[in-house]
Amino acid sequence: MPATVIREDGAYHSFCGLTCVGWLYQKIKDSFFLVLGTHTCAHLLQNVLGVMIFARPRFGVALIEEADLSKQQPELDRIIDEIVADHHPSVIFLLSSCTPEVMKVEFDGLARAVSRPNLPVLFVPASGLDYTFSQAEDSVLQALLPFCPVAPPDDRRVVFLGSVNDAIADDFRTEAARLGIPVAGFLPESHFHDLPPIGPGTVVAPLQPYLAKVAGRLARERGATVVSSLFPFGPDGTRAFWEDVAAAMGIAVDLRERERQAWERLEPHLDVLRGKKVFFTADNLMELPLARFLRHAGCTILECSSPYINRKFHARELEALDGVRVVEQPNFDRQLRDIQELRPDLVISNLATTNPLVGHGVVAKWSTEFSFMPIHGWSGAATLAGMFTRPLKRHAQLDPLMDDPLWVAGLMPAR
């Protein structure tokens, strides 16, 4: 029976969708990501992604100035010429942001106007007004979909849906070959012209829990079969994922022993996690599979909150969380009161609230980091577990230090 989802009145948006640039420009190596935005957008990308501008990364911001308010459309031709001269991309993604959305910039027409015969400029809606942190990847993949070749009905192969780094992608290809599963490729691939063919015979295996819209389009527009399974996070999710993908291809596999061995290798992490109380506030749409993994690892999940829950796309994860309090669009004021009352051992929270929580004595972890780390599949299980155990170990080491009178020597008592 799936977990009951409680819907509250909190903010749907948690962090700007423009930050999807951080992992996608590294994944699609012949791309350029151009944000039409303000100085605030530029500062966000500069500071959050930690890439100095003189490193010439394959992303940039076309700044909206006051003079642009009176123009019919922003002028981007000169900027596109500079991008082509400096980076020679095969595709440019034009990302919207809050200010031009409010100005009612017609992005579809703008993207078509600045496209070149051999260089498509694709509009990607990524504004924080409409999309939460990780959902902007969904928009990028929807923009790529028309460029995927149409596979014939008898082309029965798997397409993995979602961006993962090259090492994880190689692991998935190797595992598929070991199980006898034919693979057409990944969406997205590392290069624009290598996009996989997708058609009625294609089996789509989602790797990320925030790609519900593009998965739906693949089923509707290409007739592909979208696998409903756990997402491949942790040994439990990875086993279910591969068994379900194999079943969709008509192949019977039993990975119980493989899962048992994977849990054995995680035993040092499990010793730290067992019995811990964990609280998820809402941020990156990865909360459901992360909470499911921790529950299997022996943690008590006090609450698992997410900005958006798709009952169909997340059905298997909700089944695995039966009995857990699951909240959509949570009210953060209520969450703060619950955190103070329930005193969790670990809180998974967004960038805006993690440091204030730490300042109030709460052991907290940035949820943003999970989007950038190689945590998928068998090979990513140790990295995933370590992301939860590190803050717990650090806190355990600091606690005895804070009892040392050296820290308060010579301090006047508070009045």
From Swiss-Prot:
Q: Which cofactor does it need?
A: [4Fe-4S] cluster
**Keyword Membrane part of the UniProt annotation:** no
Which residues does the annotation say bind [4Fe-4S] cluster? 16, 41, 98
Q: Which terms in the Gene Ontology molecular function aspect does this entry carry?
A: 4 iron, 4 sulfur cluster binding; ATP binding; metal ion binding; oxidoreductase activity, acting on iron-sulfur proteins as donors; oxidoreductase activity, acting on the CH-CH group of donors, iron-sulfur protein as acceptor
The cross-references to Pfam families, in alphabetical order and at most eight, read: Oxidored_nitro (PF00148)
The protein's superkingdom reads Bacteria
Q: Kindly report, in one word, the top-level EC class recorded for this enzyme.
A: oxidoreductase
Q: What is its EC number?
A: 1.3.7.7
Pathway annotation from the record:
Porphyrin-containing compound metabolism; bacteriochlorophyll biosynthesis (light-independent)
| SUPFAM superfamilies xrefs | Helical backbone' metal receptor
One GO biological process this protein is involved in is: light-independent bacteriochlorophyll biosynthetic process
Q: How is the cofactor bound?
A: Binds 1 [4Fe-4S] cluster per heterodimer. The cluster is bound at the heterodimer interface by residues from both subunits.
> Which key words tag this protein in UniProt?
4Fe-4S, ATP-binding, Bacteriochlorophyll biosynthesis, Chlorophyll biosynthesis, Iron, Iron-sulfur, Metal-binding, Nucleotide-binding, Oxidoreductase, Photosynthesis
Q: Which reaction does it catalyse?
A: chlorophyllide a + oxidized 2[4Fe-4S]-[ferredoxin] + 2 ADP + 2 phosphate = protochlorophyllide a + reduced 2[4Fe-4S]-[ferredoxin] + 2 ATP + 2 H2O
What exactly does this protein do?
Answer: Component of the dark-operative protochlorophyllide reductase (DPOR) that uses Mg-ATP and reduced ferredoxin to reduce ring D of protochlorophyllide (Pchlide) to form chlorophyllide a (Chlide). This reaction is light-independent. The NB-protein (BchN-BchB) is the catalytic component of the complex.
Report quaternary structure and partners: Protochlorophyllide reductase is composed of three subunits; BchL, BchN and BchB. Forms a heterotetramer of two BchB and two BchN subunits.
The family note in this entry says: Belongs to the BchN/ChlN family.
Instruction: Spell out the NCBIfam families in the cross-references.
Output: DPOR_bchN, PRK02842.1
Q: Would you tell me the protein name for this molecule?
A: Light-independent protochlorophyllide reductase subunit N
